[in-house]
Swiss-Prot record:
Expressed in brain and eye. InterPro entries: ZIP (IPR003689), ZIP4_12_EF-hand (IPR049406), ZIP4_N (IPR041137), ZIP_Transporter (IPR050799). Keywords: Ion transport, Membrane, Transmembrane, Transmembrane helix, Transport, Zinc, Zinc transport. It comes from Homo sapiens (Human). Residues 1-202, 391-398, 470-538, 624-631, 685-691 are extracellular. The keyword Ion transport applies. Uniporter that promotes Zn(2+) import from the extracellular space to the cytoplasm across the cell membrane. The transport activity is temperature dependent. May play a role in neurulation and neurite extension. May play a key role in maintaining intracellular zinc content at levels that reduce the inhibitory effects of rises in oxidative stress on spermatogonia and spermatozoa viability during spermatogenesis. It is a multi-pass membrane protein. One of its GO terms (cellular component) is extracellular vesicle. Residues 224-369, 420-448, 560-602, 653-663 are cytoplasmic. GO terms for biological process: intracellular monoatomic cation homeostasis; neural tube formation; neuron projection extension; regulation of microtubule polymerization; regulation of neuron projection development; signal transduction; zinc ion import across plasma membrane. The lineage of its organism: Eukaryota, Metazoa, Chordata, Craniata, Vertebrata. This is Zinc transporter ZIP12. It is found in: Membrane.
Length: 691
């Protein structure tokens, strides 16, 4: 009966899908063709290879195994010569070792086991054919473990990458396969259903063996060839941008800028740089709708020359893909490649050295710079605790604290408004690095400075109203009216150090507030009351420690995302957080001391809570490789900065009172202006920062 009529019903669909007949006696396909056909290494694939030819075997187990052994044991030699085929192994013995019988139909498991035995035969053919090794005397498990233990110095439970390469090297020499382009080992393992990074195990090795035998009989080169596969280049480009299967437009822009930055153009001088003004490298989303009409217009010098036009990433997508795509697949990228090469050859987008885009930070730079930044942040927080030690003059302490509070408000709100929010909205990417276009490309910065001016203006009005209208008898008060929720609002009592130094009870160490003053005058009650007070104080210290730890964790997360984006973003975010941490830690340290803790214990707890910033940092670095994740972290960070600066700290600056109100007013404004000015300069010149 015909071979195809004896197939089981379950194999019929596989044969319908594999309608193209392969022949090992004709021209051999390339690795690229094999990938496009998507051979799965299933029994149907192997049997179809055996069925090719003038006299396909019947679906009889013994006949099929004999044909397979002949094709494997006697592969076609070079120059089309076919020598005598002397099989060193009987088909019946091969079938019995694999667990099969002489029935008419081969099972999938048997075909895979036979393939594994054939791999062993190929590797040890010399010993087998010289009668030094008799395969009939061993069971299947022996050959399975022998292949898994191909290298004695590696794990015998898995077929490692090196062991797989060794096997493929044998097959390339054994079969007549092309050495120019080969299917890579990782691709072969993936097609064989191997997902573990350690390699094939006892259950998946037979599948891999069937795939190797099938593709080798089809003439496909496997493993490391003389030349890489065509997919290697696309995969390298995508992996360099931390992507796997798709690119975003922003990442394609980054790739184009990198290519234009590194390219050395030798071009006729009549191609002028001002041509780029007609069509900027980075196309604004709001201007994209006018692209077609603008390119059809004639310039003053005549029609627009495509040879001198610099196309943006979005325009290349429109030209080649004829549709607006937010994600670009590997096939789409291959289709666009001629346009990218043309842009490099024409030098239309070549940038001067002082305008070249900076490359994204490497992994070493991200982890190195961010670790240094968080270390400085930790030391800065300890500086805040050191300032508390000079609290003998309470009035001077309060003035210094308000100076840092003003600086924190300026840097936090400035970083959120001038850097984080524009970056989330993509305004940084729309800046055109053109001479004479400074005010146009930085226009959003001046508008945001107007917003900051409005905040500062109303702060001045309210502060002046309080200073000029409030009764003079209230100027001597030193409490923050109604603000007890944040640690910045707390001031030390002038007797704090003396009391702590003498080891007085916690009930006598109080913050300067009316309720606390009354409590300070009360004698220490019974032991029960004292114990209750100690429990309350311990709870307060724990709350401060937990809250400070979460706060520092969020700071580390923000710094990690910032340095993942760019070194400039990391610097600006670090400065903003550092200016905020000093007054924050001063307040927290004051609360810990006032709760009855000793100086050493308070410093230790403050230091331990600051270490959570490193935890947040490395989590932020690991999860923010995706630009989308970076944007969301920046969004939340901007909201946190605005809340801390405008909701928590700015009202404190408005209502705090002192014996020298005008001095405090000047110091607060000095801190505000210094913080905003620093972030303004960073927003303007951040591209010039070189680390």
């Amino acid at each position: 009966m015909c071979f195809r009529t004896k197939l089981s019903v379950s194999w019929v669909p596989l044969f319908l899908l594999l309608s193209r007949v392969f022949s090992t006696e004709t021209d051999k396909p390339s690795a690229q063709d094999s990938r496009s056909r998507g051979s799965s290494g299933q029994p149907a694939d192997l049997l179809q290879v055996l069925s090719a030819g003038d006299h396909p075997p019947h679906n009889h187990s013994r006949s099929l195994i004999k044909t397979l052994l002949e094709k494997t044991g006697c592969p076609r030699r070079r120059n089309g010569m076919q020598g005598d085929c002397n099989l060193c192994f009987e088909p019946d013995a091969l079938l019995l070792i694999a667990g099969g019988n002489f029935e008419d139909q081969l099972r999938e498991e048997v075909v895979q086991r036979v393939s594994l035995l054939l791999l062993y035969y190929i590797i040890h053919q010399e010993e087998i054919c010289s009668s030094k090794l008799n395969m009939s005397n061993k069971e299947y498990k022996f050959y399975l473990h022998s292949l898994l233990s191909l290298r004695q110095d590696e794990d015998s439970s898995f077929l490692s990458q090196n062991e797989t390469e060794d096997i493929l090297a044998f097959t390339r020499q054994y079969f007549d396969t092309s050495q120019s382009q080969c299917m890579e080992t990782k691709t072969l393992q993936k097609k064989s259903g191997i997902v573990s990074s350690e390699g094939a195990n006892e259950s998946t090795l037979p599948q891999l063996a069937a795939m190797i035998i099938t593709l080798s009989l089809q003439g496909v080169c496997l493993g490391q060839g003389n030349l890489p596969s065509p997919d290697y280049f696309t995969e390298y480009i995508f992996s360099s941008l931390n992507r796997t299967n798709t690119l975003r437009l922003s990442e394609l822009d980054q790739l184009l800028n990198t290519l234009w930055t590194r390219s050395t153009c030798i071009k006729n001088e009549k191609i002028h740089q001002f041509q780029r003004k007609q069509n900027n490298i980075i196309t604004h989303d709001q201007d994209y709708s006018n692209f077609s009409s603008s390119m059809e217009k004639e310039s003053e010098d005549g029609p627009v020359s495509w040879d001198q036009t610099c196309f943006s990433a979005r325009q290349l997508v429109e030209i080649f893909l004829q549709k607006g795509l937010s994600l670009i697949s590997k096939e789409d990228f291959k289709q666009m490649s001629p346009g990218i090469i043309q842009q490099l050859l024409s030098c239309s987008c070549h940038l001067p050295k002082d305008q070249q885009a900076k490359l994204p930070p490497t992994t070493l730079e991200k982890y190195g710079y961010s670790t240094v930044a968080v270390t400085l942040l930790t030391l800065g927080s300890m500086l805040g605790t050191a300032l508390v030690l000079f609290h003998s003059c309470e009035e001077n302490y309060r003035l210094i604290l308000q100076l840092f509070v003003g600086l924190a408000v300026g840097t936090l709100s400035g970083d959120a408004l001038l850097h984080l929010i524009p970056q989330v909205l993509g305004l940084h990417k729309q800046e055109a690095p053109e001479f004479g276009h400074f005010h146009e490309s930085k226009g959003h910065i001046w508008k945001l400075m107007g917003l900051i001016g409005g905040i500062h203006g109303f702060f001045l009005i309210e502060k002046c109203f309080i200073l000029l209208v409030s009764p003079n008898d209230k100027q001597g008060l030193s409490l923050v009216n109604g603000h007890v929720g944040h640690s910045h609002h707390l001031a030390l009592n002038s007797e704090l150090s003396d009391q702590a130094g003498r080891g007085k009870s916690a009930s006598t160490i109080q913050l300067k507030s009316p309720e606390d003053s009354q409590a300070a005058e009360m004698p220490i009650g019974s032991m029960t009351a004292s114990n209750r007070k100690c429990k309350a104080i311990s709870l307060l210290a724990i709350m401060i420690l937990v809250g400070d730890s979460l706060h520092n964790f969020a700071d580390g997360l923000a710094i990690g995302a910032a340095f993942s984006s760019s070194s400039e973003s990391g610097v600006t975010t670090t400065i903003a957080i550092l200016c905020h941490e000093i007054p924050h830690e001063m307040g927290d340290f004051a609360v810990l001391l006032s709760s009855g803790l000793s100086m050493k214990t308070a410093i230790l707890m403050n230091f331990i809570s600051s270490l959570t910033a490193f935890m947040g940092l490395y989590i932020g670095l690991s999860v923010s490789a995706d630009p989308c994740v970076q944007d969301w972290i920046f969004t939340v960070t901007a909201g946190m900065f605005l809340y801390l600066s405008l909701v928590e700290m700015l009202p404190e600056m408005t209502h705090v009172q002192t014996q020298r109100p005008w001095m405090m007013f000047l110091l607060q404004n000095f801190g505000l202006i210094l913080g905003w000015l620093s972030l303004l300069l960073l927003a303007i010149y951040e591209q010039n920062i070189k680390i």
